[in-house]
C-alpha cells in the first residue's frame, strides 16, 4: 500500500466550526491509522475576506483537540507565483485561453438563456479566438474543457459519479486581476503536496469534475475522493448556531472535553459495529473511510452531553483541577486531599460539563444565603429545630474523618426520635446546602468539615 497523504484545507474567512473539525478528524485518522502524512493548508487566496484571527483560531482549535499535522502549514497566499506558472503552462499548451467577455455581455447572455429556459452558462465564444483583443477589457483565463467526454470517478462515500463534460462550460481558472480561482489552486496544491485521498464535505462534490479536468490537463495523478454528507440538527435541518454550528473553541469554553468532542464528531457519519465510545487510540485502530455513511448525520446535544459526562467521570482529581482552571469557582485551598477527592468524585458523577462541575463546586462550598422556598414551607419547625439543635451537639463528638461515623450520627437521631428519615434529612440538607437536592449528606458533612457544618446549621436555626 502506498503512503496515505491527506490534508485539511480551511478558508480563514471565519472560525473553525463543527463540520470543519469533523472533516479534519476524518483526514487525520485515515492518515495516522496508516502511518501516513496529514497536512494543514490555509486557503487564503481571497485576500479581501481573510482574517488572521480566524487562521490563528483554526490552529488553536487543532492544538486543543490534539490534531498534529506534519511539516509547516501551507498558506496559499504565499504561492501565487507557483499558480501563475501553471496557468501560463496551460496557456502555452493551448489548454487554456484568455476570455475577453465583459460582465455586461455575460449577464446579457445569461438572461437570454433563462428566457429560452436553458441553464445559464458561458458559451465558450472565446475558446478559439485568434483576433485582436478588444480594448479596455482585462481578460480572465478559462480552461478548455474537453467536449463530449464523460468524467467518472468512484467516490468512497457516494459511489460511482459520472458527469458529461458538455454540462460544464470553460470555467475560469484566473480572474481578470490575475488571482487564481478556488478549483485551480486546490488542484495545484493537492497535486504538488502529493495528496492521495481527499475527505471533504459533499458540498464540494460539484467541484470535483472541474478539478478532474484540471488534473488531466496538467497530467497530475487524481486522488481518491470521499464526499461526506453534511451534519443536520435533530429536526433534519442545516445546523445553525443554536444547534451546534459554532466556533469549535466555544465548546472548550462551555466545558466540553476534547476527548468527548473528538469521539462525538468521529461518530457523526462514521460507524464501527455498535460501539459508541472510542479513545483516540481506538479510533486509530478502527477508522476506515470505507465505513463513512452516505446519509446525513444528526447533531445531538443529548449524545454529546452523555459522552462528555462519561469522560468527565473518568478524570482523576489532579486532571480535573487542571481542566477546571479556566473556570471560576470557590477556593479549594482549605480542603485537605481527602475532602478534595470526595468533593470532585461526588460532583463529577452529577455533572455533564466542566462548567456545570464548577457551578456545583460553588453550590457546595458557598454557604447558603437563602433557602429553597418550596422545601422550607413543608418543614414542621416545631419538630425540625430541636432535631437540628441536638444533631449540632452530636457533631461536636463525631469523627469527621470517617463518613460512616457521620452516617451513624444521623441515623442515631432518627432512631432516638423515632421519626422518618426524611423528616430529619430534608431540613439538614436545607441547612447545609440551601436546597432539597444535591450530593449525599454524609459526603456534604465530610467535605464541609466540622466547623463549617456546625456554622451552617447554626445560621439556619437563627433564620
Swiss-Prot record:
Record localization: Cytoplasm
Any one GO MF annotation of this record: glutamate-tRNA ligase activity
GO biological process, one term: glutamyl-tRNA aminoacylation
Gene3D superfamilies: 1.10.10.350, HUPs
Chain location of the short sequence motif 'KMSKS' region per the record: 238-242
Pfam families, per the entry: Anticodon_2, tRNA-synt_1c
Residues holding ATP: 241
Record's signal peptide: none
Catalytic function, reaction form: tRNA(Glu) + L-glutamate + ATP = L-glutamyl-tRNA(Glu) + AMP + diphosphate
Main enzyme class: ligase
Predominant location category: cytoplasm
Keyword terms of this UniProt record: Aminoacyl-tRNA synthetase, ATP-binding, Cytoplasm, Ligase, Nucleotide-binding, Protein biosynthesis
Keyword Coiled coil applies: no
Gene Ontology CC: one annotated term: cytosol
Known EC number: 6.1.1.17
Intervals of motif 'HIGH' region: 10-20
Self-association state and partner proteins as the record states: Monomer.
Annotated function: Catalyzes the attachment of glutamate to tRNA(Glu) in a two-step reaction: glutamate is first activated by ATP to form Glu-AMP and then transferred to the acceptor end of tRNA(Glu).
Family, per entry: Belongs to the class-I aminoacyl-tRNA synthetase family. Glutamate--tRNA ligase type 1 subfamily.
Name the UniProt record assigns to this protein: Glutamate--tRNA ligase 1
Organism in which the protein naturally occurs: Helicobacter pylori (strain P12)
Gene that produces this protein: gltX1
Amino acid at each position: 500500500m502506498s503512503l496515505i497523504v491527506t490534508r485539511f484545507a480551511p478558508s480563514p474567512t471565519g472560525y473553525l466550526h463543527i463540520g470543519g473539525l469533523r472533516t479534519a478528524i476524518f483526514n487525520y485518522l485515515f492518515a495516522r491509522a496508516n502511518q501516513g502524512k496529514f497536512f494543514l493548508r490555509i486557503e487564503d487566496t481571497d485576500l479581501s475576506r481573510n482574517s488572521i484571527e480566524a487562521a490563528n483560531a483554526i490552529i488553536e482549535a487543532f492544538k486543543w483537540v490534539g490534531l498534529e499535522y506534519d511539516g509547516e502549514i501551507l498558506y496559499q497566499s504565499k504561492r501565487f507565483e507557483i499558480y501563475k506558472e501553471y496557468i501560463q503552462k496551460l496557456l502555452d499548451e493551448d489548454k487554456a485561453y484568455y476570455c475577453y467577455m465583459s460582465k455586461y455581455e455575460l449577464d446579457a447572455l445569461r438572461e437570454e438563456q433563462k428566457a429560452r429556459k436553458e441553464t445559464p452558462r458561458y458559451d465558450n465564444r472565446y475558446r478559439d479566438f485568434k483576433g485582436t483583443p478588444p480594448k479596455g477589457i482585462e481578460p480572465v483565463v478559462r480552461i478548455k474543457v474537453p467536449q463530449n467526454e464523460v468524467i467518472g470517478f468512484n467516490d468512497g462515500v457516494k459511489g460511482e459519479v459520472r458527469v458529461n463534460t458538455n454540462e460544464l462550460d470553460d470555467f475560469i481558472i484566473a480572474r481578470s486581476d490575475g488571482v487564481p480561482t478556488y478549483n485551480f489552486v486546490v488542484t495545484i496544491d493537492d497535486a504538488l503536496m502529493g495528496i492521495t485521498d481527499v475527505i471533504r464535505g459533499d458540498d464540494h462534490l460539484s467541484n470535483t469534475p472541474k478539478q478532474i479536468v484540471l488534473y488531466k490537463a496538467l497530467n497530475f495523478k487524481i486522488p481518491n475522493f470521499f464526499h461526506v454528507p453534511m451534519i443536520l440538527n435533530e429536526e433534519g435541518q442545516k445546523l445553525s448556531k443554536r444547534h451546534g454550528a459554532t466556533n469549535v473553541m466555544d465548546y472548550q469554553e462551555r466545558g466540553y472535553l476534547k476527548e468527548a468532542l473528538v469521539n462525538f464528531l468521529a461518530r457523526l457519519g462514521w460507524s464501527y459495529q455498535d460501539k459508541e465510545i472510542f479513545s483516540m487510540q481506538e479510533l486509530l485502530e478502527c477508522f476506515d473511510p470505507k465505513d463513512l455513511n452516505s446519509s446525513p448525520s444528526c447533531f445531538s446535544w443529548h449524545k454529546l452531553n452523555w459522552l462528555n459526562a462519561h469522560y468527565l467521570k473518568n478524570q482523576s482529581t489532579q486532571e480535573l483541577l487542571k481542566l477546571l482552571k479556566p473556570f471560576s469557582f470557590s477556593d479549594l485551598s482549605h480542603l485537605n486531599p481527602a475532602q478534595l477527592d470526595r468533593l470532585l468524585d461526588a460532583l463529577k458523577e452529577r455533572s455533564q460539563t466542566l462548567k456545570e462541575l464548577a457551578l456545583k463546586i460553588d453550590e457546595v462550598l458557598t454557604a447558603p444565603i437563602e433557602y429553597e422556598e418550596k422545601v422550607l414551607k413543608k418543614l414542621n419547625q416545631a419538630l425540625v429545630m430541636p432535631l437540628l439543635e441536638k444533631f449540632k451537639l452530636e457533631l461536636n463528638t463525631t469523627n469527621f474523618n470517617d463518613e460512616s461515623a457521620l452516617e451513624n450520627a444521623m441515623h442515631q437521631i432518627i432512631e432516638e426520635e423515632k421519626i422518618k428519615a426524611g423528616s430529619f434529612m430534608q431540613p439538614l440538607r436545607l441547612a447545609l446546602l440551601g436546597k432539597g437536592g444535591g450530593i449525599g449528606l454524609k459526603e456534604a458533612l465530610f467535605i464541609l468539615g466540622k466547623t463549617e457544618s456546625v456554622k451552617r446549621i447554626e445560621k439556619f436555626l437563627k433564620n
